[in-house]
Each structure stands twice: as structure tokens, then as C-alpha cells.
Amino acid sequence: VNHYTVSKKRRHKDSYTSGGEGFKRPDRAVIVYSQMARQAFPDANILIGGIEASLRRLAHYDYWSDKVRKSIIIDANADLLMFGMGENSIIEVAEALDSGLDIKYLTYLDGTVYKTKNIDDLNEADYIMLPSYEEITTSKRKYAESFQKQYLNTDHYNAKILVCLLYTSDAADDR
């Protein structure tokens, strides 16, 4: 996110690297590091968060590649994404995992995104169906509709669960 200027020129300084040196971190660092962790530790739980994950938690327009990309949880092959500040959700996740709960059951936490192929356990009154990834990549109107629904559901006190199908036959629940 911090590597390029608005005109897509590479920055020589990196405020988030020790000493401010540029060119120390890869582009799309969350994706790269998650994939490396998955390769080194195939059975480990991969949790992602921070500014990059928060901004890309749902399907989004990617300025660098000039296209709509899937949620970063898909590209990073992560198990759970925590968005926003995350100070509360990280404690809840740590306590749940420490108690022996499998990460696939951490679907009840506010401020998280998880992948699933089954939304049957969700109460229809508790979620909003976003246009599918397929729809938003082919229709600007559907992209705008999805963005509006996301925007109207950012307040964690009143927001509903946002469900987005990657394709019409493959469900992903973005919370």
C-alpha cells in the first residue's frame, strides 16, 4: 500500500521499514508472507490483519493491476482476517485458540472475515448478500451496489454479516 505514489512510481523511502529504507518489503506483503508461512507450516493457522488486510477484506478495485481482485483472505490463503484496529478481536481469537477451539469455528467474532462453503447456519435476518465476485467484475453497477452495502455496514454495533459468493456455486462469507 505504501510502496507507490499516486502516479504508480516506486517510493525510495518506506516509513514502515527500519531506518526508512525502501525496497525491503515485497509488494502485496500480506499475500507473500502468508503464502510463505503456509508453505513452511502447512497445518498452521494463518491469521492476517493490519492496514493491507483491512482495506482489501472484500473484493476491491486494485489500482496497481487496474482490476477488481478477490478478498485478500482468498489470495493469501489465510484462515482468518481481522480488520480495523483488531485489539479486541486478537485477544478473543487467542483465547479461543488457547482453549482448544478450532479456527474454523471462529465465525462469531465481530471484525473478522472467514471463508466458508456453507451459509446454512446463518439467519437470513442477520446477513446481507453482496453481489458475487463474478457480478462485480462484469458490472460497474453491481460493483457500486456492493460498495454501498459495505459502506452502510461498517459500524460494528449495527452492521450485518456481509456474504459474498466468489462464484455462483462457491460461497465465501465476509464478516
Question: What is each of the regions a protein language model found here?
Answer:
Residues 85-98:
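Two-component system phosphotransfer/interaction surface
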Residues 79:
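Conserved, mostly hydrophobic/aromatic
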Residues 31-38, 94:
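Generic structural signal for well-ordered alpha-helices
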Residues 50, 58-72:
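Short, glycine/polar-rich helix-capping loops at beta-to-alpha or helix-loop-helix junctions
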Residues 1-25:
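A solvent-exposed, charged loop/short amphipathic helix patch at secondary-structure junctions
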Residues 167-172:
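Conserved small/polar residues in nucleotide/adenosyl-binding loops
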Residues 117-165:
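Extended catalytic-interface subdomain
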Residues 41-48:
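Short beta-strand/loop segments at the ligand-binding rim of alpha/beta enzyme cores
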